[in-house]
C-alpha cells in the first residue's frame, strides 16, 4: 500500500456523500477545512450546508448506481468512426454478418463464413461488420437493425457471462431495452456462439441474442450454434456452417441457378504481401514510439493502448515457496489513463527470448530480417480471397515481430495445419498435417494436439520440412498475441498514478514434457522496475471497465471471497474503504475469506491485510490454509463455518463478491452459498435458486472469475 498518499476526494464527492446519506454534514464540514484550500473552503461549506438542508427532500430522487445489471461500455475509440458507405441498390439480396470478438476468433469465423458464402451466392451482397462500428448510439442501432432482413451473428461470451468489448454497447441496447414487440419481424437470422463449457454461463450472450430475436419476431434459419473452446471450436463452427447452406440455397439461389451448388469450395490461405528491406538502409529503422501506442490521447482502449513503465516489482511469496507471485505497479502518471477500483488492466507482454529464438530457427530466417506486411497488391488493389487482420506496425525486425505480435505457445488451429501442409516439402509430412486438419482426423487432432497441449512451435518442430513464407506465417499460422487481463489490485483513491497487478507465475509441465511458461506472468516476473534502473521494462496497457464495484451505500455489509490472486480486487476495495473512512464516511462491516497453501509460503499481502483490520476497514479476516493441517481446507469450508454471519449480512442488504478460478473455486463457492441460503433461510431448493438469482440480478452477488 502506498503510505502517505493524498486522498483523491473532490468537493463534489463530499457534497454527494451528504446527498446519498453516506456521511453527515458536520463531519464533512470539518473535513473540508483540512482538505480544501482557503479559496474553495468557504464555497464548499456553503454547498455542504445547503446539501444537508435539502437531503430530506431529494433523498428519494437520488440515483444510486446498481453495480450489476449494467454492462460496462468500453472506452470510446480514439478516432471517429468512418461514415458508413452508402448501400448501392444493385438488385442483390443484402446479407449482414456481425461479430463480437475479444481475441479475434469470432471475427475469423465471421469472415471465413462470409468468404465461402460470397463464392456460393453471386446474387447476394455480404457485409462483415464489427458490432461496435455498426451504430454510434442506441437510436442508430434501433433505426438500422429493424431494416435488416438476413443477418448472422458470431458472438463470444467473455468473463462471467459478459459480452466482448466490441459487443458491449449493442448488447446493452439489445438486452436491456424496452420490449419492442415484433421489432425484428423482417429479419431471418442465425447465431453462432463462442464460449467454454467449463464456465457457468456457457455461451450466455449468444443464447440471449438468439432467444430475444425469436421472441421479437425474427425467423431462426438454423439452430443456435454453441462453439465450445474446451474442445475443438473449429469443428463446432464447421458443423453449424454446413446446416446453413441448404437454407441459403433456398433464399439466395434460383431454381435454374446451379452455379456453385455442387462446386467444392476451397478457402484461400490468408497471406500478406511482404516487402523486405536492407537492414543496413538508414532510412528503415524501428521506431519505438511509432508502433501504435496512443500515449498523449485523451482516451484509450485495447486497440489503442498506452506504453507504461514498470515502477515497482516485488515477489510476494517467501523463499520457502516453490511457486511465485509478482506484485507489479505500472506508472501511469502524465498518461491520462484513469481507472476505478475493481476495473481490469489489459497488458500486452512479450514472448521470452528462448521462445523467440526457437521460432527464428524453425522459420530459418535471421532475427535481423527487416520486413513490412501489406494487405494490398503493389498497385494498391486489395488482396483477394482472404480475410487478413490488419497488419501489425512495420517495418520491423523478425525478432520484434515474433516477440511482440505472434502467439507462439498456443495449440495451432486446424486452419494453421492446412497452411503448414501447403508449404511442407516432405510429402509424408504434408499428408500427416492434412489428416490432422480433416474431419477424419478429428480424434487424432483432439488427442495429439489439444489433449497434449502441443504448442505451435512444437508442431512446427515435428514437421521440419514445412517452411511457410512470412506472409503466410503471420497471416494464417501464428495468431496475434493477445493482451492478458488482470483485476487491478489498487484504488485510485490511494494510488491515482499507479496501476497495481497481482500475478501468479504460470510454470507447469505439459503432457509432452515441455515446461509451459506463461507469456505475461513470465514477463512480469522478469520485469526491471524504475526503482532499480532507468532502463526499466514497459508494456502497452489499457483499462477495461468492470461492474465489480463496492456498493454505493458504504454502510451496507460486504462479503469478499478470493483465494490466491483472487485477492487482487479486494486489496483495491480495502484501499478504497480506508480512503472513505478517513474522509468521514460511515462504513458497514466487511469480511474477507482468503485462501492459500501455507502461512509461511504464500500468504500474500499478510501485513497489509492485518493493517486493514487494525484500521477498522476489514471487520474479519478469515484464512483457509490448504497445506497446513491434516486435511485440506478451502474458502468454501470457512464459509460453512461462518454460515450464520454470512446469512445475517446478506439479510441486511449485504453484497457478496467472488474472485478467482471459475472452473473450481467459484463453482464450490456458488454451491456453498446455495447451502447457506437454504439452511439459514429455511428455503426449499427451488426458492434457493430464485433467491440467489435475484441477488445476481440486483447486483448484490458479483463474480470476477477466469
Swiss-Prot record:
Biological process annotations from GO: piperine biosynthetic process
Gene3D superfamilies per UniProt: 3.40.50.360, NADPH-cytochrome p450 Reductase, Chain A, domain 3, Nucleotide-binding domain of ferredoxin-NADP reductase (FNR) module, Translation factors
Record's bilayer topology term: Single-pass membrane protein
Keywords carried by this UniProt record: Endoplasmic reticulum, FAD, Flavoprotein, FMN, Membrane, NADP, Oxidoreductase, Transmembrane, Transmembrane helix
Cofactor-binding details, from the entry: Binds 1 FAD per monomer.
Highest taxon of source: Eukaryota
Pathway assignment: Aromatic compound metabolism
PROSITE patterns found in the cross-reference section: FAD_FR, FLAVODOXIN_LIKE
One GO cellular component term: cytosol
EC number in record: 1.6.2.4
Residue intervals passing through the bilayer: 43-63
HAMAP family: NCPR
Protein name according to UniProt: NADPH--cytochrome P450 reductase
Organism field: Piper nigrum (Black pepper)
